[in-house]
Amino acid sequence: MATRHQVRQSVISLLYAFELNSQNNVFVDEILDEKKIRNEQKNFTLNLYHGILDNLNNIDETLNSFLNDNQITALGHVERAILRLGAYELLFTDTPSAIVINEAIELAKELANDNSPKFINGVLDALIKAKK
């Protein structure tokens, strides 16, 4: 059974693939099969993924307000995907903020460049503070 962390890694992969080929969703099942995401975890993954896509404009507008010199579209694909996942969980789910931040930082350490964890932490922390 996949862990929640592995599920979030899969969501990042799905968002990345979506940006490269949004016209064809055939990649969804391929990615989930490859990462052995099944049953309840597959449902959790798809709920996160579709929730992000359904709220993408709102998420991006919110994130843009916390990006000083950049727009979300100017960031790298991986950083953008991690921020979108984190923002979605903070804005639309009951996942505790500390877990969202920790997961986003860990994903950034694993998948993005060396400066990304600090950057992602700063943006999501600002979002949490503004939400209070």
Curated annotation (Swiss-Prot):
Instruction: Give a GO biological-process term.
Output: DNA-templated transcription termination
Which species does this protein come from? Answer: Campylobacter jejuni subsp. jejuni serotype O:23/36 (strain 81-176)
Under what name is this protein listed?
A: Transcription antitermination protein NusB
What this chain does, per the entry, is described as:
Involved in transcription antitermination. Required for transcription of ribosomal RNA (rRNA) genes. Binds specifically to the boxA antiterminator sequence of the ribosomal RNA (rrn) operons.
MF terms from GO for this chain are: RNA binding
Arranged from A to Z, the UniProt key words for this protein are: RNA-binding, Transcription, Transcription antitermination, Transcription regulation
Q: What are the boundaries of the signal sequence?
A: none
**In this UniProt entry, which cysteines form S-S bonds?**
none
Query: Which Pfam families does the annotation name?
Result: NusB (PF01029)
Q: Species lineage, top-down?
A: Bacteria, Pseudomonadati, Campylobacterota, Epsilonproteobacteria, Campylobacterales
Q: Entry's SUPFAM superfamilies?
A: NusB-like
Which protein family is named in the record? Belongs to the NusB family.
Q: Which is a Gene Ontology cellular component entry for this protein?
A: cytosol
Q: Which InterPro entries match?
A: NusB-like_sf (IPR035926), NusB_fam (IPR011605), NusB_RsmB_TIM44 (IPR006027)
